[in-house]
Amino acid sequence: MYLNEFSDGLVARDMSDHPEFASLKQSAAELGISFSEGAGYASRNTVIRHQRFHFLEWGDVDKPTLILLHGSNQSAHSWDLVSLHLASRYHVLALDQRGHGDSEWNRGAHYTIADMALDVEHFIAAEGLTSPVVCGHSMGGMVTLALARSRPDLMKAAVIVDMGPETNDEGTRMIREFVGRNIEFDDMEEFLDRVVKYDAYRSREHIRRTLKYNLIQRADGKFVTKHDRRRYLVNEGGKARVAGVPGLDELAKLPMPLLVVRGGESKVLTADAASRFVDAVPTATLRTVPDCGHNVASQNTAGFLDAVVPFLDGLG
């Protein structure tokens, strides 16, 4: 059983009057995140590459488009505070990537970064988007880099959040271990206790309001995390699921403006690795956001916006 509301067909569902939206606005007010009361907010589905994808649409379609790609084990809702703030100036599309959130799980368990990058390419075509900015966090950052390498003509600019061609093994191991230890729960409070212990940057109440987007309830009453765990398996032909991620030598050829955003206390993207990344790419700049770890946009939303908005506004 799903715990959150979303469109169950190809007709958009207006979420602007839903209690979930009221809860989000309450979180934004408590965190000092400004937003426009009139910003449009809808849940939508599309079918691309023979698979149903769910996404959240914010703002006016006549505004510049920003595509948001979430990290591993997360969903489009991980961007809600960011989307709410930006909706007055941008047409924001936050995609639930394959096997995540409210999108369909892939029948063949094909979850390489190359697969996901091709999904985004087809999503851009299906929505008729012209030169969007693509912003990806963690896994979504890898997808953004892969798309930038394969189809640089599709995007106006890219924002990479706490990810790069070099990552710290300790940081990625900590994430894998947390995910591996937290699969099913007797009740939502059990999951909440574990997330609060793991993520010291967000308040318990803020985390509580987002739980419904990360869990589903099975027929036996257990709560389980809402993503396809098969994606951790090795894909066909012996290719690891990270197949398709470009290296520094390939990224050096990227023609579009690139912003790298690092969490100041991140254990995934070290300061040295971030510096090597931007030094290798002539079009890249680096912004470090204090008081947050790997999940920059949710752990310090105001700081993330301070880093990203000037970059977006400067694109013209």
Stretches with model-predicted labels:
Residues 39-42, 48-58, 83-87, 93-135, ...:
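Active-site loop/oxyanion-hole signature of alpha/beta-hydrolase fold enzymes
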Residues 218-279:
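Conserved serine/cysteine hydrolase catalytic core
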Residues 292-305:
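Catalytic histidine-centered segment of alpha/beta-hydrolase-like enzymes
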Residues 71-81, 92:
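Serine-hydrolase catalytic-loop signature spanning alpha/beta hydrolases and amidase-signature enzymes
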Residues 130-169:
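Conserved hydrolase catalytic core segment
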Residues 1-64, 88-90, 129-130, 309-316:
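Alpha/beta-hydrolase fold catalytic core
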Residues 63-71:
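Short beta-strand element of the alpha/beta-hydrolase
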Residues 2-23, 166-227:
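Helix-rich cap/lid subdomain of alpha/beta-hydrolase
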